Amino acid sequence: MIFISVAESQQGRLNALYRGSVSATVLAPPFDSMARQLGLRELADLRKLDVEYSGTSIAATGGYVKSHPAAVESFLKGYIESLHFMRTQREKSVAAIMNYLKMKDRARAEEGYDYYVELMPPIPYASANGVKTILQSLAHQQPKAVNASPEDFYDMSFLKKIEESGFVKSLGAKSASTRAHDRKS
């Protein structure tokens, strides 16, 4: 059995699966429904398995984080703002999905939006249990992963600082004032 790395794009993984280059892969909406339409069978829905898994990560080297803390904080603020935009601007977000994935099928784009808006937290804190699941899955390749501490793989200090500064709450206030302005216009 050949299993393709999740480092590939979803479109690339779907193409490889359809061509028979791999036996299985991981797909999320809208690519999972595309696979079903092509006659491929779903083996499991990770959302229904009650397994916490860190599927989306933001990474930087320790050296970069130490030497460029302002850039790290600025990036994270932008990322948090984009998550807020996604949650509060459905139509624009669906349009962006269709544009960047070159999709014509609005229903599939909405399916992808609904999946990700539910999946992505307002503040992207790492999950110790999610990282532990990944470490356990790597144990056959990296025996040291079994005994590794999940906390050694992430630094939440920047996110805590951003949250404590009131930045995240201010996004909600901006949304409310924008909606009020839109109603007056």
How would you label these PLM feature ranges?
Residues F3-I4, V22-S23, Y125:
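Residue-level marker of alpha-helix boundaries and capping positions
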Residues Q11-K102:
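Pocket-lining segment of extracytoplasmic ligand-binding domains
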Residues M34-A35, E52-Y53, Y115-Y116, D155-S157:
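Short secondary-structure boundary/hinge segments and terminal tails
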Residues S67-A148:
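Secondary-structure end/capping motifs
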Residues M1-S9:
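Short beta-strand-to-loop elements that line the ligand-binding cleft
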Residues A28, L46, A109, S149-P150:
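Short loop/turn and capping residues at structural boundaries
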Residues M1, E42, D105, A145-V146, ...:
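Residue-level detector of short coil/turn "hinge" positions at structural boundaries
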Residues A139-S185:
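Conserved C-terminal helix/tail region of periplasmic/extracytoplasmic solute-binding proteins
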